[in-house]
């Protein structure tokens, strides 16, 4: 485990801990995102962090906050962040500080600002072969191949009559006799409740089906009236890495979020199968 030192005050508190050895850590530099990190031009405070005898400093890093944008002002801001970071690293080294491994770029930093070279690159979302959303800027186009699919199974199949309701709140009322199926995924697994009654599509046995009614904690219901062959245990695709209509980006867009949030919220109850 390697700790992040988020600022000078944090580093000072380390001195009060009863540690049996120096704390392995990386130092976070705030170059403009203003989330965590000691500000890049607070050189006196930064030097005190690096001279803290309780720290074993293995690296130094910052984070770009608009590297995925093609807006002129955002590109200029990112370039300024890079300039601030490089200047800070240079000054620390000139003062004799060992900054360790240096890293700045995450996925879009690596794609759009790859002329900058550091020791590490923190690849995140593009490891899944997807973009954060369909509007994300890529200066250097990558032919990304999605690798993640999300599946559930049919747990029940039944017929309902016209005017029957489905799930909590009776938000779906059948306008005709329908065939429906319950499937084994809900908002506790990362299928957000906000997608209830949004004409969300899933795929079962090669057929698209709509999610109907409110999404429950552990289950949801789909309309399978037009699916001729369906039975308990059949696989249902919520995300299909080989189907653009069931992409992670489209799922996230429908939930008014980004794929980073959606994928990070997939619950631990979901088995991970690597192939």
PLM regions with names:
Residues 1-103:
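Active-site-proximal beta-alpha core segment in soluble small-molecule metabolic enzymes
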Residues 7-12, 23, 73-275:
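Active-site anion/phosphate-binding pocket segments in diverse small-molecule metabolic enzymes
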């Amino acid at each position: 485990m390697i700790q992040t030192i988020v600022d000078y005050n944090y580093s000072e508190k380390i001195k009060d801990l009863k540690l049996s050895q120096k704390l392995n850590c990386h130092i976070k530099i705030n170059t403009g995102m203003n989330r965590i990190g000691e500000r890049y031009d607070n050189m006196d405070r930064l030097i005190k962090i690096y001279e803290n005898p309780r720290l074993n400093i293995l690296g130094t890093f910052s984070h770009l906050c608009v590297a995925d944008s093609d807006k002129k002002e955002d590109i200029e801001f990112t370039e300024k962040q890079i300039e601030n970071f490089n200047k800070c690293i240079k000054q620390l080294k000139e003062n004799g500080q060992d900054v360790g491994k240096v890293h700045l770029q995450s996925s879009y930093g690596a794609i759009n600002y790859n002329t900058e070279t550091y020791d590490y690159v923190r690849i995140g979302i593009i490891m899944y072969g997807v973009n954060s959303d369909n509007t994300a800027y890529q200066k250097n186009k990558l032919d990304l191949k999605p690798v993640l699919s999300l599946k559930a199974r049919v747990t029940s199949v039944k017929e309902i009559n016209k005017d029957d309701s489905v799930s909590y709140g009776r938000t779906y009322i059948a306008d005709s006799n329908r065939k429906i199926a319950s499937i084994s995924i809900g908002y506790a697994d990362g299928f957000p409740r906000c997608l209830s009654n949004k004409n969300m599509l899933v795929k079962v046995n090669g057929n698209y089906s709509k999610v109907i009614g409110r999404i429950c904690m552990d289950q949801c219901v789909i309309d399978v009236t037009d699916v001729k062959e369906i039975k308990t245990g059949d696989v249902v695709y919520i995300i299909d890495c080989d189907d653009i209509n069931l992409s992670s980006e489209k799922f996230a867009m429908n939930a008014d979020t980004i794929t980073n949030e959606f994928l990070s919220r997939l619950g631990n109850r979901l088995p991970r199968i690597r192939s």
